[in-house]
From Swiss-Prot:
UniProt protein name: NADH-quinone oxidoreductase subunit H
UniProt gene name: nuoH
Function: NDH-1 shuttles electrons from NADH, via FMN and iron-sulfur (Fe-S) centers, to quinones in the respiratory chain. The immediate electron acceptor for the enzyme in this species is believed to be ubiquinone. Couples the redox reaction to proton translocation (for every two electrons transferred, four hydrogen ions are translocated across the cytoplasmic membrane), and thus conserves the redox energy in a proton gradient. This subunit may bind ubiquinone.
Major localization class: membrane
Pfam families, A to Z: NADHdh
Amino acid sequence: MSSSPSLNTWSDALSGFSIGWFPLGLVIVAAIPLVFIALYALTYGVYGERKISAFMQDRLGPMEVGFWGLLQTLADILKLLQKEDIVPTVADKFLFVIGPGILFVGSFLAFAVLPFGPAFIGADLNVGLFYAVGIVAIEVVGILAAGWGSNNKWALYGAVRSVAQIVSYEIPASIALLCAAMLAGTLSMQQIILMQAGPNGFLHWFLFTNPIAWLPFLIYFISSLAETNRAPFDIPEAESELVAGYFTEYSGMKFAVIFLAEYGSMFMVSAIISIAFLGGWTSPLPNIGGLELNTMTSGPVWGAFWIIMKGFFFIFVQMWLRWTLPRLRVDQLMYLCWKVLTPFSLVSFVLTAIWVINH
C-alpha cells in the first residue's frame, strides 16, 4: 500500500500561531476539542452500560431523567458535584488527592495519537502505538497512589492486585500489538490504518488478509480486559473480598473521575484493537462492481464514524462479558497470563515474522 504524508492536522494548523510567550497554550488549544469529545462519549458510555446491563437482566434501566433516561448520567454528575469530598483523617492526603488525577491523565493522554480519520489526529507519531501502550501504563502509578494514600487495607490489597494484573498482562498485549506493527512495517497508528485501506473494505484488514492475525487479535482482546479491570478480570474490585478495591475511600467527583478514567481506558483499548487489526477509520464496505460503497462511505466524517462504532462494538462486548462470565481467582488469572497468553503471544510473533519474510 502507498503511504501518505504526515497528518499532524491540529499541530500543523496551530504552528503558525503564537499565544504570547506560553508555547504550552498551543497544546492546550489543540487538546480542548479532543477532551470534550472524549468526555461526551464516555459520559454516555456509562449510560450505555446501564442500559445493556438492564437489557441482560430483563429490566428497563434508566428511564425517568430525559427521553429514555438519556440525561441520567448528567444528573448523576450534578449529584456527585454536590457530594461532600471526604478525605480520611488517616490518609496520606497528597497521594489520596493526586491518585485519581494520575488515573485520569494516563487514560486521556493516549487519545493524542488516536486517529479519528484521515485528517483528524492530534499527533501522528512514528512510535504512536508504542506511546499509546506506554502512556496507559501510567495508570499503574495512579492506582498505587490511590490504594496506598487511602491508608485502608482493602484499598491497598486492591491496588496491589491491580498493579500485578496490569503489569503482567502488558507483556502479552504488547507482543500481540507488535505483530500488527510487523505486518504494517511501522509503529505509526495512521500508517498502520493506511496499510489496511483499499477499495475492498474489510478484505484489506489484517484480520482477513493474514490468518495468523487472529491469534494476536484474541490475545490482545483478552489482555485488554485484564488491563482495564473488566470482568472476568475484575479481581481488584471484588466486592465480596475487597469492598470496592483501591477506590473504597473515594467519594464525590474523585469517585467519578476514577470511573471516567476506567471508561476512557475501555475506549482506548477498543480503538487500539480496531486500528491494529480492523482497519481503524477505514470503511468495512467493499466496492461491488459499479456500486462504490467503499468510496461513498469514506472521508473525514465517515472515518470518525467508523472508528467510534468499532470502538463502541468492543465496549459492548466487554459489557456483555461482564454479565456472562464468572470472576476468576487470582491463581487462575496469573496462570492464564504467564502459562497461556504469553507463550501463545510469542508463538504468534514468530509466525507473523515468518509470514512477513515469505510475503
